[in-house]
């Protein structure tokens, strides 16, 4: 990619016109990651990227993009806003490399769906996917920056907190296929209602060039014009005969004949698998390859990982994030389990004025489960007056309590929003000897 193209797309001005015939390899916002021939973009956020320009040049940067007028002996593009510039460059990369892009949004299940789609598509295509949860106005461009010329497919998450954010991302990368996993209560504090969350998620169609795939069993999505999957008869791809455990599920779908599919996911995540299957079929993946891929799928770290510790405890490590919908799903799995259960639950964040209302629904979910001890963590959970529940401020207090307990042969659920860092409790159980 040449400097003139970058200059045009960012609508910037050249400060230093040395060697404008250079070809840029990659775009980076971390000066430590710069290699020879890369472009360093000085973002201004929690830290000011302009402070690290000298390090970027030392590491081999061939071009820098800045929003402050600085003079270095290197080609430099001055723009009004480097945060907006990375979006413009992401659009340029999209047009230059032109992979088929699959964009995914939804209240819950974005990462699981992305991983499932990637697992299926890589059986036939060279694929690229979002790293971690790179799904906002910074993360999506970073995902595009990592694209290679020979990537045929890019599977990209899109998250949001407010109206307009997904519209911006969709127009930036103009997806060929879009996915909405479901409509729940995540970010309801900012948007005010599920109806508004639906409107915000549907912004993914603003830049969409092809079909929309949705969970047709979701009551907010079933009336949308889309390719649908689920268990209801209104769907284009219909699953049936579902059997499941904590670690896996088996179900059937009908194509030219019935096919049985096994995937290492519990029942409340099968809607994500069905969307992935539907997209795989749309993109001409043989059903036998889809079945093989799903049978070998392993869930993402801290998302419904089933672990064993030295005391024969089974740990459900689901502490990457939480919502009322995902918590309901995992607690439903435990209703018929006879094991002694320890439910370690932390706050659900980003609920705004709806926080008390949603947290107050949790006791009704807990009432359905027998043989349980309940540990509630965080300022919102402390407001829940649940019978015999133990409350702690944070994971550190919780671990101090657990050190005094003898816990063996139990089924332990650990779940909360990301900021509570409950993976530290998981690590405590797995590494008792080091505490």
Labelled PLM ranges:
Residues 104, 110, 301-303, 419:
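ATP-dependent carboxylate/acyl-activation modules
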């Amino acid at each position: 990619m040449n400097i003139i193209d970058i200059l045009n797309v960012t609508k910037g001005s050249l400060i230093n016109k040395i060697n404008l015939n250079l070809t840029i390899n990659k775009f980076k916002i971390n000066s430590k990651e710069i290699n020879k021939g890369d472009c360093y973009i000085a973002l201004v956020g929690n830290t000011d990227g302009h402070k690290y320009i000298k390090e970027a040049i030392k590491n081999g940067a061939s071009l820098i993009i800045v929003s402050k007028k600085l003079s270095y002996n290197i080609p430099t593009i001055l723009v009004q806003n480097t945060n907006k510039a990375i979006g413009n460059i992401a659009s340029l990369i999209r047009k230059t490399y032109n992979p088929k892009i699959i964009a995914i949004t939804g209240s819950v299940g974005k990462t699981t769906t992305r991983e499932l789609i990637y697992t299926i598509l890589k059986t036939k295509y060279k694929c690229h996917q979002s790293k971690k949860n790179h799904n906002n106005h910074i993360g999506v461009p970073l995902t595009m920056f990592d694209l290679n010329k020979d990537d045929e497919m890019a599977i990209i998450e899109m998250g949001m907190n407010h109206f307009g954010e997904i519209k911006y991302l969709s127009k930036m990368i103009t997806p060929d296929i879009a996915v909405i996993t479901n409509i729940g209560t995540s970010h309801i504090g900012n948007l005010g209602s599920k109806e508004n969350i639906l409107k915000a998620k549907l912004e993914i169609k603003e830049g969409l060039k092809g079909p929309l795939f949705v969970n047709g069993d979701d009551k907010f999505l079933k009336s949308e014009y889309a390719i649908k999957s689920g268990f209801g008869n209104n769907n284009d791809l219909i699953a049936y005969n579902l059997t499941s455990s904590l670690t896996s599920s088996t179900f059937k779908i009908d194509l030219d004949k019935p096919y049985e599919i096994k995937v290492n996911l519990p029942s409340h995540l099968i809607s994500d698998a069905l969307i992935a299957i539907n997209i795989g079929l749309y993109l001409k993946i043989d059903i036998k390859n889809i079945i093989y891929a799903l049978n070998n799928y392993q869930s993402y770290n801290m998302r419904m990982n089933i672990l064993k510790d030295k005391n024969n405890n089974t740990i459900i490590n689901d502490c990457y994030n939480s919502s009322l919908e995902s918590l309901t799903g995992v607690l439903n799995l435990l209703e018929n389990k006879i094991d002694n259960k320890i439910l370690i639950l932390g706050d659900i964040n980003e609920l705004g004025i709806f926080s008390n209302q949603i947290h107050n629904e949790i006791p009704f979910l807990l009432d359905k489960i027998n043989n349980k001890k309940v540990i509630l963590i965080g300022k919102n959970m402390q407001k829940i007056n649940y019978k015999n529940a133990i409350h702690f401020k944070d994971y550190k207090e919780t671990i101090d309590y657990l050190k005094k307990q003898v816990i063996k042969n139990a089924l332990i659920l650990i779940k909360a929003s990301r900021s509570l860092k409950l993976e530290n409790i998981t690590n405590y159980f797995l590494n008792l000897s080091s505490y």
